[in-house]
Design a protein with these regions (language model features):
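N-terminal assembly/interaction segments in proteins that build large macromolecular machines
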Residues: 1, 6-262
Length: 262
């Protein structure tokens, strides 16, 4: 048994996404063993539910209540039916959705079991009237980047104020310990906050695909190429067992290897 139901962490969980042009949705479904997650019937159910989640608006209760095609059951009842059929517990844990008025929502799956199922699912929304194929290409690369770096926010403006305040307090305390004059300390804090942004804010991070330019500059560069504004509107990152402390791999290196091999 690989599943700790008290913490919702299962080594055999799957995340899955579905995209449809300017919108995309992602789900996480827990099962008890790797055998089930490798089962084609189970994968079909996961894929079907991911497709239905495009119409659920990111609301789990709405998704659970939607009709599951060809069965006369809703999604929640279908999950219960699968439990009875396969003989193992499973749980539709969460869903989320991303949509833009014009542009694309692109997806990337890390540690994929199938192209749209695996261990880390990322959706990225790019808003633009420009060429959709090129937007899709950059969107997928940024999604790879997000899988590797796990940013805290899309932009500085939408960084959690409590997170920023906590970091400022830590940096201020560290700077004061240096014993330097107050005006120097203020400059030190400003510099360190900028460095913090570059670590945790997607638009400020160095793009792992090229290792040189910031993500916001890569997006702006595509806008110039297309002759149309491109705005990075947001991202969703689902990793199995999000919020639970566990051993972390070097995803940046893994993603870089995946890109170079693509």
């Amino acid at each position: 048994r690989n599943c700790d139901w008290s913490s919702d962490v299962c080594s055999s969980d799957l995340v899955s996404f579905a995209t449809d042009g300017a919108k995309g949705a992602v789900i996480e479904l827990n099962s008890e063993t790797d055998f089930v997650s490798r089962n084609e019937s189970f994968q079909k159910v996961v894929g079907d539910i991911a497709g239905l989640s495009l119409q659920a608006g990111g609301d789990l209760d709405t998704l659970l209540g939607m009709d599951y095609p060809g069965t006369g059951r809703n999604v929640g009842d279908e999950v219960t039916h699968q439990v009875a059929t396969i003989g193992e517990n499973m749980n539709l844990r969460r869903t989320a959705m991303l949509e833009v008025s014009d542009g694309v929502v692109a997806g990337y799956m890390h540690n994929a079991v199938t192209p749209s199922m695996g261990k880390i699912a990322v959706l990225v929304a790019l808003e633009s009237t420009g060429d959709k194929a090129k937007l899709e290409g950059l969107g997928k690369q940024i999604a790879m980047h997000v899988a590797a770096t796990n940013p805290a926010s899309t932009s500085i403006d939408d960084l959690d104020p409590a997170l920023l305040e906590r970091e400022k307090n830590v940096l201020t305390e560290q700077a004061r310990e240096s014993g330097k004059p107050e005006n120097i300390i203020e400059k030190m804090i400003v510099g360190r906050i900028q460095k913090y942004y570059e670590e945790v804010v997607l638009t400020e991070q160095v793009f792992v695909i090229d290792g040189e330019n910031r993500v916001k500059d890569v997006v702006a560069s595509l806008g110039k190429e297309l002759g149309a504004d491109v705005t990075l509107k947001g991202f969703i990152r689902f990793e199995l067992g999000d919020g639970i402390e566990k051993e972390e791999g070097d995803f940046a290196a893994e993603v870089a290897a995946a890109v170079s091999g693509a």
